[in-house]
Every structure is written in structure tokens, then in C-alpha cells.
Amino acid sequence: MGCRKSSCPRHHTPKAGTFPPRWFPSAEEPGKKGGQPARPTVVISAGTSEHETITIARRRRTPQLKARHLLSAPANASDLSSSKLIFDVCRSPSDLLLRVPTTNSEHQQAELCATALRPTRSKRLMTENGTAQTGTVPVEQPRNGTMENAKLNMAEGDSSRMESGSKNTASPPVKADNNAAGTHSSPKKRRKVNHACVYCRRSHMTCDSERPCTRCIKRNIGHLCHDEPREPSKRARSEHEHSTAEEDGHSNNEFSNAQSMPRNVDVQDAAGQQILPDGTVALPPSSVSAVQHNTIPSSSAQNSLGHNSQQLLGYNEWLGGQSQFQDMHTFHPSYMFNAPEVTNEYNLLGDFLSSSLLDDGGMFSNDNLQGIYSDPTLINSMANLDNTALLQQAQPSQPTQSQPHQNDSVQGPSSTVVNDKARETYYMTAADPSGSDPPEERMNKLLKAKYDAGLLKPFNYVKGYARLNQYMEKNMKQSSRQKILRQLDKFRPKFRERMQSLTDIELILVEMWFERSLMEYDRVFASMAIPACCWRRTGEIFRGNKEMAELIGVPIESLRDGKLAIHEIIVEDQLVSYWEKFGAIAFDNTQKAMLTSCTLKNPNSSNPGNGIPCCFSFTIRRDNHNM
């Protein structure tokens, strides 16, 4: 039949609004047998006042209740089916009475019977889905719930408790345990590594231990992500610190260390030499003298062209530019032949930067310039050049009587000193490209920065012809040498005449296009398994693929930046035939390519009989000046 006493909260629920906000069961509560607590129950009653709140009371084995175990939270009787009720879990079972506020006139009552909670060592926040129905609905108390709305309900309880002005004391919120919440997981922070990659280190950003790192992959420069070479002492110390950090596992300290990363980072090249901020490098006296000797152009070559010597980069500036990009070559010497990187022009950046850094003043090749003359950014930048510097480069040299020549040394004007800030901007733009600009615009910005830094200058073809003549004197017969010189005398004056009619801006724009074309040929060479190479009209090879290097038996680095020439890999009689064919179609607009046969050789082989007979075709690229 059930208990008929009105004081039994299990079988009789008072009407809404007839009991105080805090209900304390008496000691004579039914269900007590032999001093044992009654079955834990949860009584939910709907109130009529807008300011009434839910009161959750915990009872120990004795009927005494303590105020610090009370917790209030707002709720709505109509939303009980979707709300979550918060309980303060303690060591012993409890009876919970909940007073539910309502904004309508309906009186809803519900009684939820729950099983006894098992004792736990620490207090935890438990949640339970309640169901608001008319009558009695038994619900089982879960042992593990979710923490999704725990903090929100507690905050709402505090605000509702202040509005109602009730005198109930709420217990302080208990910190949730991640282990108790099966479906909750805090966001995983990026852990700081001891040694960041070169680009994260320059940007002072947090890097990870993967190579390529996540940040470089998002910026589309994953193929360039690598660590800078370090000294053995620093490497050993960083490895020791890394192992210690893994054992300790202090993520907070690691985050603070990442925030306090020093702003100034010393860049070191592959040889371990420190590069100063101004781009200077400490060199022994022998290296200094060697560089000074190599940077002085030939006076006869300058007089033959009728031009003054171009501005020269000091050995400190040149070596600073070379060493900062040396790590790019040591990291991926043959990266251009990897299929995933064919479509990205910046995977060839290291080779592009190193090209023409050794070139001092003179003339250079010209090809089709469409797409460069239409760029207003480059034109405006070059139009703002110092007029004095341009006139000093274009006019022939006129020695004065008051200043006699001493040791025939060539000195550039003081106005042509390269700006350190412009050079630093170029290095950062080249090594760490960023932004969402199209590849064409990024390449224009890169070329503009290289020009502003004074590192983009015309190619000296006079040195190329002198190199060819020197090779023929040492390795070829007199008859073959005379035939080649006869062909050179036919087209070389025409090239010289047309080059002298061009302005300095036109010459630099042509050189920009040439370096852009080299990057295009890199993608073409990488996409086909056919030996191929690209050389200037004087014969210096500036690009080649690995198939070509394997064919003639040289490393791939030899087919870059003019280290090898076409006359060094072709046998003597076939070389004479090549120059005759080239002289015939050099200024003939009707002919562009020619298919012929030749015999290649290894430039390092002493036996000329070991030739490689093959059939090849060469294509001539011409510019707007028909060169």
C-alpha cells in the first residue's frame, strides 16, 4: 500500500510553495530502521515564485544537516527534461530535495528515486539528466557523467541565489577532475622545442619537433624547413636540456620560456662562422687577398666595351650574402627533382639567390621581356635611382690628370654603397616568403628587393669569351681554334653593338627575366627524364638536371651558375660544328631550334677517346632586342 504519512518524502510530496526553500528532514523520518539511513531519494517540486531556486541538501548517516553542504542553482520546471542537475558527491548516500522555480501557473511535481552513491575519496561534481513529469519517475544516479555544463549551472546558481536573497550558504565550487569526465579533454598546447627551425626562429614563433614543422607547412614552405647548423657544444647542451625537460614535464615553465625567447638571433653558416648583423665575416688574411684579387675586373675587358666598371660589392658584403644561403644548398642539393615540389617556384630559391652574385659589371644575355616591362612596381623603383650613379656607370671612364692611377685599382663611387637595410629586407623576403599573394607577384617583390639591395646586376659576357679563348688555347688545335674564332667574329660585334644601345634599366630588367626563366627551366627539367641543360651564349651552363649530370659523369652542382661550360663537355670537332651552327642562326628570326648530333665527354677525363655519341637539339631564346 505504501506509507501514508505526510512527512515521508518518498511517497508524499507537499504542494508547490508550501515548504521553505531549505527543507530539513526530521529525525523521526520513516524508513529508518536500526539507525540506518533511508533509501536516498530526490524530490523535485515546482514553485510559483520566479525567485525560488533549487535547493540541494546532503544528509549524512545522522539526520543532522550542515549549511556548507547546500547548493542552489536556478532551473525551470518546464526544462527539466533537458537540464542537468548538479550534486555534491560525498562519502555517504544522501537525500536530495530540489525546489524548482517556474514562471507559469502550472504546478508540476516529480519524485526521482536514485540508488546510493558509492563512497569516493574526494569530492567531485556529478551531473544527471532530470525528467520533469507529472507523477513519480525512478531515475538511476550515474557514477560517471560529463562536465559540459557544470560550471555554467554553478554560475547560474550563484546569480539566482543573489536575486532571491535566500540565506542558504553554498559550498565553494569543486575543481573538476578530467579523469571523472570521460568525454572531456582539454585543448592540447603546442609544446616548445629546444631548437626551432630556421624560419620559426627568425619569426620568434613556437616551433614543434616535426620536420617540416606545422607552421612551415601552413605557409607553403615545408620543403625549406630545416634547422640551422650549430656548434657541437651547443648541440650537446640542447640535447641534455631536451632530455631533462621530458623527464620533468613542466608545461607551464616551457610556455614561459617560449614567451621570453630572445629577439636577436645569431645566424651561423655551415662552417660555424658567425655572421654579424651588417653582413661582414671575419676572414684570414689569405682569404681576404684572394677575394680582393677576384673582385677586380679585367681592365682590357672594360676598355673593349667602352664602359666604366660597374659598382663592386665588397668582399664582406659578398661573403655575407653567400654564407646566409649556404644552408639552403647543404640541406637539399637536389631538391628540384622531387615530384611534390615541382609546382612550387620557391623550392628553387637557393639557386636563384646565388646566381649572378659573383657577376660584376658588364653585359648580359637578353631574352623576351614581356611581363616585366609591364610591372609598374619595378619600373617605379628603378626610376628612382640616383642619377649620378647611373651616369657614372653609363659614361666611359675619363682619367683625370690631377689623380694619377695607382696600382691600376678600380674603385666604385661612394654613392653606390649598398644599403644594409635594403639588403636585410631582401634576405628576409627571399628566405621567408609570406602572405597570400600569387606566385607572380611574390616573384616581382623578390626581384625588386634583390635589385634594391644592389645584388642584381648585368652579366659580364666579356669574361665568358675570355674563358672560352683560354680553354681553346690549352685544349684545342690551332686549326679548330681559328674556325671558332672566325665564327665569334661574325656575331660578337653585333651583340656588342646592340648591348651598348640599351639603358641600365633595360639591362637589369633583362637579367630579371633571365633568372625567372632559369626557375621555369628547373620545373621543365624536373618533369622529364631527358638530359637537358641551359647555358648562356658564351657557353656557361647555369642549369642542368640530374640526368645530364649522370650522362657526363659530374655532380649536379657542377651544372649550376657557370661552373662548367658547353665547350668543356663536347669533343673538339663537334664543338667547332656547334659554333658554326650557332653563328648561322643567332640573328635569324626564322630559325629557333636545330636538331643535330654530337659527342659528349667527361670534363674530368684525361682520355678523349671515351666519348658519348648522342643526338641533341638546342633552342635559342631571343628577347625584344633580337638577341
UniProtKB/Swiss-Prot annotation:
Q: Basic and acidic residues bias: where?
A: 225-251
Q: Which GO terms describe its molecular function?
A: DNA-binding transcription factor activity, RNA polymerase II-specific; RNA polymerase II transcription regulatory region sequence-specific DNA binding; zinc ion binding
- Lineage top rank: taxon: Eukaryota
User: Which function does this protein serve?
Assistant: Transcription factor that governs genes involved in reductive and siderophore-mediated iron acquisition, and carbon metabolism. Suppresses the expression of sreA and induces hapX to stimulate expression of genes involved in both reductive iron assimilation and siderophore-mediated iron uptake which is essential for the maximal virulence. Also regulates genes involved in gluconeogenesis.
Annotated region (Disordered) at 1-40, 129-148, 155-193, 225-258, 277-305, 394-416
Task: Cite the source lineage.
Answer: Eukaryota, Fungi, Dikarya, Ascomycota, Pezizomycotina
Q: Where in the cell is it found?
A: Nucleus
Biased composition of type Low complexity is found at 394-403
Q: Where is the composition biased (Polar residues)?
A: 162-171, 286-305, 404-416
Species per Swiss-Prot/TrEMBL record: Aspergillus fumigatus (strain ATCC MYA-4609 / CBS 101355 / FGSC A1100 / Af293) (Neosartorya fumigata)
Write out the GO cellular component annotations.
nucleus
Q: Kindly summarize what the UniProt induction comment says about this protein's expression.
A: Expressed constitutively with similar lebels in swollen conidia, germlings and hyphae.
Q: A Pfam family this protein belongs to?
A: Zn_clus
InterPro entries to which the protein is assigned, alphabetical: PAS_13 (IPR056751), Zinc_cluster_trans_reg (IPR053045), Zn2-C6_fun-type_DNA-bd_sf (IPR036864), Zn2Cys6_DnaBD (IPR001138)
Query: What does the UniProt keyword field contain?
Result: DNA-binding, Metal-binding, Nucleus, Transcription, Transcription regulation, Zinc
Knockout phenotype, as recorded, reads: Leads to attenuated virulence in mouse models of haematogenously disseminated and invasive pulmonary aspergillosis. Results in increased expression of sreA and reduced expression of hapX iron acquisition transcription factors. Also impairs gluconeogenesis.
**Keyword field contains Glycoprotein:** no
Its protein name is Zinc cluster transcription factor acuM
Annotated region of DNA binding: 197-225
